[in-house]
Amino acid sequence: MTRLYQPSQDWPACTLSYRHFHLLWTLPLCAVLFLVARPFLTKLDRAKLILLPIIAFVWTTPWDNLIVKNRAWFYHRHCIWFTIGYVPIEEYFFFVIQSLISTLWCTLLTRWALPNLYLVPSSPKRRRLATPAVVVCMLCFVLGLKAAVPETHSYYFGMITWWSSLPLALLLWGSVDFVSNMGVRAGLAPFALSVLAPTFYLWASDVYALRRGTWHINEATSLNVFPIPHLPIEEMLFFLVTNLILVSACFTFDRCVAICRQSVAENAPPLSPSYLPLGSLDTYTKLWAAFVRSDRPPVATSAASASVEPRDLAASLQVLRAASKSFNAASLLLPWDLRTDLGCLYAFCRVADDLVDDDAQGLEAKSSNLDVIRAIVDAIYADSPEAAPQKQPSAQPVSDRIRTLLAPVALPDKVKQDTRAAAASIAPLTRYIPKRLWYEMLQGYSLDLLFEHPDADKRTRLRTMDDLVEYSQCVAGVVGEMCTRVILGRCGGAVPLELKVDRTIAVPSTKAAMAGKALDLTRADDVHALLYEARRMGVSLQLVNIARDIVPDSVELRRCYLPTDMFDKQDARMQDALLAGHIAVRSQHTTTLEEKELVQPRDVRKYALRLLRVSRGLYDQAYPALAQIPNRPARAGLKAACSVYAAIGTRIEAQTETDVAEGRRARMSNRDRMLRAVSAVYFGV
């Protein structure tokens, strides 16, 4: 047997120093992964990047020193810088850099899923995989200890086995059933790829280093089994189990934070990817409590609950996917907690809009549905901070209240289910969104309904640009304020519900852009300024929407949102024609009017372009304010969402004569959406 204290002459000479190995294999990959992930890194992700390398370093250091002391590994002196204990400094660096690589890679793969969708209530099946996993790990621990006898061929294999079994037992107990509940697409596949991809990469790097003598595995303490040429089975096992530990830890963090987010706190938001104060001992106490308890306690029944039923959340997100591909795609860039909140908020807006516009026939039925929506808002806010102090909270769950309200309404069951789910899902947001903002949105829907009023004198007719801005404030500017309030609240800086925002937006605006001006969001004036810009952005994007849909709104809905004072003198009758649907669209052949009495789409186009110029002016002034959002991944997602939607204006400008004549809506391809989103996220344009 080769003596452990003296290297063999048969071992390869070192032609690659450990430092150069890192420059070739680990540092470039880590840098690339960090640059790609940087715009999306939440406070939870940063916690993983801080805590996991520290834990890995502490757990591995004594074990690695023992391994090297017993000559399972060997390093040529001229290939390393210096040692601390028995281990080269570059090896300590490897502990950290591998943890960063695997954690960043796992973050990029798993950020698209919503962990809160997969929390399950306590049941005997809760630990159906965890218990066997712990038993297997403990068995491996015992066998590893028996095999880890110095100066034997099983030593290195046994050391890896017992050393990895303890953390794996703990982490698999906390994550394996959670991953299983997520299914193949959201859980098992990302989990496997998160483990295997860095494992294969590190196997390749290990072969490269072993062939060049950067380090050497002592044959006397190895099984000398080489599934891959030059790569001992112990090295393959080491990188596999270390990546398995790191990925299990990432999923365990996600599960614990998802559980914590269900809690209700009076003076602070629940722990989430957007709010995770690492400097507070209370954070670690809550995380540990979440680790050891059931995934989902009974859901709170009041509107103050911090959580959303997974079934309601899934239904709301399905509404979002069907209603707006652009918003749904851009929302994927948000942290999963904000994607949950803003997705539910947008879903309720869409459901309410559909109840008023699409799911009822006739003005009377639509007006009745508007009253139902108003009653739903009242029911949601019955237990909110805005409710009268002397009023006792209702014992009836929010979801049941809404179901009761919808029961007598003549709507399809699917519509009722979607409405109830979306409404119940916004209940946790009542602590951040004032009730009056929902009423403001309903005022905009009322204006839409008045387009159909039988009395011509009472029908909606926008006279001035101020009227158009007022309408846009109601249906879009208010949504911008809501979203901003939710983001600030979830990040720990809740806006007082009584704070009202100036609704005066001059077109063209005389207010300066916010570029280069840092806001102090602890000051009411600066918070007001940010909310104002959020409203201005909402109005800007609504004008894009109106410009895109001038022809379809006229043909399908008999509506015209262009104000009277926008039309040139020679087009004085165009507004009446658009309100009557008298527009010469090639694809429409049902009209009995002569061609000369119809408005030509090409004549309408100039007003669409004029409206786009107004929109672009507001957009250019409001866009810099996104940099003031105190949450980097939220900034990335909002920049992408706003940029993608504003780019529809560019598609309108690029429409062909045929597109215009046929009244086609300008649309963006998935490729164009992706390019715009990437440009906004990484380059800010």
From Swiss-Prot:
The keyword Transmembrane helix applies. It is found in: Membrane. Its EC number is 5.5.1.19, 2.5.1.32. Residues 262-685 are annotated as: Phytoene synthase. PROSITE patterns: SQUALEN_PHYTOEN_SYN_1, SQUALEN_PHYTOEN_SYN_2. Keywords: Carotenoid biosynthesis, Isomerase, Membrane, Multifunctional enzyme, Transferase, Transmembrane, Transmembrane helix. It is a multi-pass membrane protein. Residues 15-255 are annotated as: Lycopene beta-cyclase. GO terms for biological process: carotenoid biosynthetic process. One of its GO terms (molecular function) is lycopene beta cyclase activity. GO terms for cellular component: membrane. In the N-terminal section; belongs to the lycopene beta-cyclase family. NCBIfam families: CarR_dom_SF (TIGR03462). This is Bifunctional lycopene cyclase/phytoene synthase. It comes from Sporisorium reilianum (strain SRZ2) (Maize head smut fungus). The lineage of its organism: Eukaryota, Fungi, Dikarya, Basidiomycota, Ustilaginomycotina.
